[in-house]
Structures are given as C-alpha cells and as structure tokens.
C-alpha cells in the first residue's frame, strides 16, 4: 500500500488555514516528500506520521513557496537525533539553492545526498521509491514527478517445475536474481507469472498543460495538480505559467487517471470560496485538496 498526504495546498504565501505546497508519500514504512514550503515541518507534526523514516525530498522547482521550509525541516530532523543521510533531488541549480538555505543550519548531524538532475525526462530509484521525472514549462526549470510502487509478478510453482528449476533457487529468482549452475542459467521469468499493475501517483505544480504531461500521468491512481485559480483567469496563468483548475481537469480526463486532487491555490482564493462544481463537469472525480488530506492506495488483484 502507498499512503499519500497533501501536507500543504497553498501557493505563493501561507494562510491561517493553509500551509504552502508539499506532499508526503509513505511506502513500505519509508517516506518521500515533494516540495517543502514554509512551515512544512509544522504540518508534518500535525499529521503525526513522524520524521524518522523520511528518506527523500524532491523539489519541483526553486521558487520560495516550494523550498523555504527546508531549513526548518532540517533543524527539526537534527533535533530529533537523525543520523541517516537525507537524499534531496531537484532540477539544475540544486546545490546552489541548498547551500544558500542551509546557512542557518550548518550543525545538522546528518549528511545531505544531493542529486541534481539534468533538465530532461528520466527515471531513478532511491530506496523504496521508483521516481519518474518530466520537465514542464514554468518561469524557471520545473519538474513533474511520478512515484510508483512496483509489484513483483506472482511466483508460479508449476512454471518453475516445468522449467526444471531447482527448488533451492526459487527464492533468489523470485527476488529478481539470475542464478548460474553447471553452465545453465536460471532467470526470474522461468518462475514468475505475468507483470502485475503497481501503484502510480503523479504530482505537478506550477506549469502550463502540455501533451507530454498527459502521457506522463497516464492511468495514474492519483494525480495531484495545481489549480491556481478556480475561476477563469487564463491570461494571468499564461503570463506566470500556471494552470487553471479546469485545465488540470482536462489533463486528468485525457490521461485517464482515477482521481484528481487540486492543490497550490492562490492566496486570493480562501478555502471557503473554492467551488469546483464546474470543474467536476469536466472530470467528475475531482477533489479540492485540503491540508493533511490523506489517501491509502492498495494494489489491485
């Protein structure tokens, strides 16, 4: 199972009822954070999932409302006695940004493993997390992310016996390893069944809609996307390269995602004024995100 929490749903500046943008994923007991706006460590504390098993932080881009929570988060982790390294991933410019933000927390007790990615589509694996990255159009280099929980095919006893695989190697092959014995090579496909669908969650803020994004989020179990403005402010979002809620809904529909969470709302739109009735006419399974809203996504049989 993959647990998702929308820690903050605000864009530009925080409001009393709305922290700045951040999303937390929990998979096999480990955690991954996307973006770290001001006060992220506070909303994490309110959530109650703890800090200890946070392994990865992914930045979409380096505007202040997505990164200024980093010093507070690092100090919180340090005060909790953390010793394990924290991996931080982001587009070009990561080292410069982290160096600047961490001037006030030089005495943290753990290392930062910085992975500064080239501005191109790519995939990587960090610990429990399979991460896909897509460059998207914003005022500065910006990434959309997809987090996947991969699922091993089922072990098929009859197939292993049919292929005359020694039983002593079944476990190793089930784990994806090849085994060689007396000139014979045994491969995982000799004991495993068909590929099984995993869990896919896509996250995108601060960009204009593009065809590549629709492909990137295809068939996602959950698509979290900015809806900077609920009403028609098209010229405004084009100028600053953001997305309307209606545009996010069209991406969700074209991408055949199961559920859309809107986030990164303009501070001009308080929670009480968010009405997505018209948005749901475009994509019915749309939800207006709220701070610390959670969802558990299980594997399909």
Predicted feature residues:
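General small-molecule cofactor/ligand-binding pocket signal
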Residues: 5, 89, 113-118, 132-134, ...
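Active-site neighborhood of phospho(di)ester-bond hydrolases with catalytic His/Asp-centered motifs
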Residues: 34-37, 54-62, 90-91, 202-207, ...
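Metal-dependent catalytic neighborhoods of phosphoester/phosphodiester hydrolases
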Residues: 69-76, 98-101, 270-278
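A gly/proline- and charged-residue-enriched helix-loop-helix capping module
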Residues: 93-105, 114-119
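Binuclear metal-ion centers of metallo-dependent hydrolases, dominated by the metallo-beta-lactamase
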Residues: 120-121, 210-301
